[in-house]
């Protein structure tokens, strides 16, 4: 019987890669916590109706890409294809709006879409996202954009560009929709099959087509910016002004429409020239009607999601794989020494030092070679004599200096030793 392998469109995040993921999560959590965003953890699967109502039945996500099944109670269940709908459902269900103020929330976790797998796009993929609920102010739009750029720049990403558009309010979009259909209808036979289908049910999505012929046709399409009402136009102008005041560069892209029906007013994407076809690292916008659509009170909101797989592809181009290196590597030989080694390892870990214990039981020479390969700052050596005398040999790996300490002395000098390890660690990292 053959070995079972991971399903197509999924992949294992192996130990040597996990450091990148932890780095992204740590940076995002630090930046978002400083802006008073609180983490929320909705379920991975929800009632299918949540996404049909929230995302829109005419979207590709709902029509083609969702993992939907019946559970044993004959309920229609869907693995979440995105994070916003679940956060909004939780916001409504738990009356988070009752405080009357702004709710700043963020989340991270896996999402699921049945797509053709390629670099940076999997059927199980991961996002970090945020939602700012309760403010229709243009400053909220700029706040979330600024936080996204802060995260990406803190991670060291270069060659980023911010595409910006407004899709207006519902009335603006209805007026524009008709103008777009009137323009595209004479070209229907020349559009790609997906766009021909969208012409009737979701024509704005044609602007986002990747088909070259369709893209050429759309170049001369009317711009949605020409159909914005006074209120929508003012909101968008204020967003642009404040982005400029923050020195956040952007370019207007009237063809930018997000793939989900709930967006209103500001829509944006952050892209990288270093990613090829899958260039979008972050996408988001305002969705003032979604809370009402899902049964809650009228609540303006804005948010975004960062695709972690694509972000990590960029990090891997920028930096070597993050590795864990121990402060101390413990080598021991002999039953009593090996037991004492484990006890010391635990005590040192409790003091905040990273410690690797050699469990091979092999000769000292082989253990020393392994210690050297780990990049450890120091090595603790315990043999029969040390075990008998309750001592250890402390060897600094860079200088080969070695000293004998009683185990009591070692533990009593831990604070001083920690400072020495900090200096060695800083020197090594530099």
UniProtKB/Swiss-Prot annotation:
Q: Does the keyword Nucleus apply?
A: no
Please list the GO terms describing molecular function: ATP binding; histidine-tRNA ligase activity
The record's EC number reads 6.1.1.21
Q: Which UniProt keywords apply?
A: Aminoacyl-tRNA synthetase, ATP-binding, Cytoplasm, Ligase, Nucleotide-binding, Protein biosynthesis
Compartments annotated for it: namely: Cytoplasm
Quote the Gene3D superfamilies the UniProt record gives: Anticodon-binding domain, Bira Bifunctional Protein, Domain 2
PROSITE patterns, alphabetized: AA_TRNA_LIGASE_II
Q: Which reaction does it catalyse?
A: tRNA(His) + L-histidine + ATP = L-histidyl-tRNA(His) + AMP + diphosphate + H(+)
Q: Report the record's Gene Ontology biological process terms.
A: histidyl-tRNA aminoacylation
The EC category is ligase
Q: Which InterPro entries match?
A: aa-tRNA-synth_II (IPR006195), aa-tRNA-synth_II/BPL/LPL (IPR045864), Anticodon-bd (IPR004154), Anticodon-bd_dom_sf (IPR036621), His-tRNA-ligase (IPR015807), HisRS-like_core (IPR041715), HisRS/HisZ (IPR004516), HisRS_anticodon (IPR033656)
HAMAP family, per database record? His_tRNA_synth
Family under the similarity heading? Belongs to the class-II aminoacyl-tRNA synthetase family.
Q: Which PANTHER family match?
A: HISTIDINE--TRNA LIGASE, MITOCHONDRIAL-RELATED, HISTIDYL-TRNA SYNTHETASE
Under which name does UniProt file this protein?
Histidine--tRNA ligase
């Amino acid at each position: 019987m053959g070995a079972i392998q991971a399903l197509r469109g999924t992949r294992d995040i192996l130990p040597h890669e996990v450091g990148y993921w932890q780095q992204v999560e740590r940076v995002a959590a630090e930046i978002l916590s400083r802006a008073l965003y609180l983490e929320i953890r909705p379920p991975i699967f929800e009632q299918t109706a949540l996404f049909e109502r929230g995302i829109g039945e005419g979207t590709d996500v709902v029509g083609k890409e969702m993992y939907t099944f019946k559970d044993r109670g004959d309920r229609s269940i869907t693995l979440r294809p995105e994070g916003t709908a679940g956060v909004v459902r939780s916001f409504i269900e738990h009356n988070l709006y009752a405080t009357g103020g702004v709710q700043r929330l963020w989340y991270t976790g896996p999402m699921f879409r049945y797509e053709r797998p390629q670099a940076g796009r999997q059927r199980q993929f991961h996002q970090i996202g945020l939602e700012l609920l309760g403010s229709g102010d243009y400053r909220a739009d700029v706040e979330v954009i600024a936080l996204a750029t802060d995260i990406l720049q803190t991670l060291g990403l270069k060659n980023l560009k911010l595409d910006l558009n407004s899709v207006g309010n519902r009335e603006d979009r209805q007026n524009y929709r008709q103008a777009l259909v009137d323009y595209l209808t004479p070209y229907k036979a020349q559009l790609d099959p997906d766009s021909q289908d969208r012409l009737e049910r979701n024509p704005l999505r044609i602007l986002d087509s990747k088909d070259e012929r369709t893209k050429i046709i759309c170049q001369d399409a009317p711009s949605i910016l020409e159909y914005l009402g006074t209120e929508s136009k003012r909101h968008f102008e204020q967003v642009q002004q404040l982005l400029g005041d923050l020195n956040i560069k952007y370019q207007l892209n009237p063809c930018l429409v997000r793939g989900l029906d709930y967006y209103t007013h500001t829509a944006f994407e952050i892209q990288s020239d270093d990613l090829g076809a899958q260039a979008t690292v972050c996408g988001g916008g305002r969705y003032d009607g979604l809370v009402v659509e899902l049964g809650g009170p009228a609540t303006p909101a804005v948010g975004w999601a960062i695709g972690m797989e694509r972000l990590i592809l960029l990090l891997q181009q920028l930096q070597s794989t993050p590795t864990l290196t121990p402060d101390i590597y413990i080598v021991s030989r002999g039953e009593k020494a090996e037991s004492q080694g484990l006890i010391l390892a635990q005590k040192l870990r409790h003091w905040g030092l990273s410690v690797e214990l050699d469990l091979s039981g092999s000769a000292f020479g082989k253990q020393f070679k392994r210690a050297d390969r780990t990049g450890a700052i120091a090595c603790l050596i315990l043999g029969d004599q040390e075990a008998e005398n309750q001592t250890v040999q402390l060897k600094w790996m860079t200088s080969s200096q070695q000293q004998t300490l009683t185990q009591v002395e070692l533990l009593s000098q831990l604070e001083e030793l920690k400072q020495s390890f900090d200096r060695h660690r800083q020197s090594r990292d530099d």
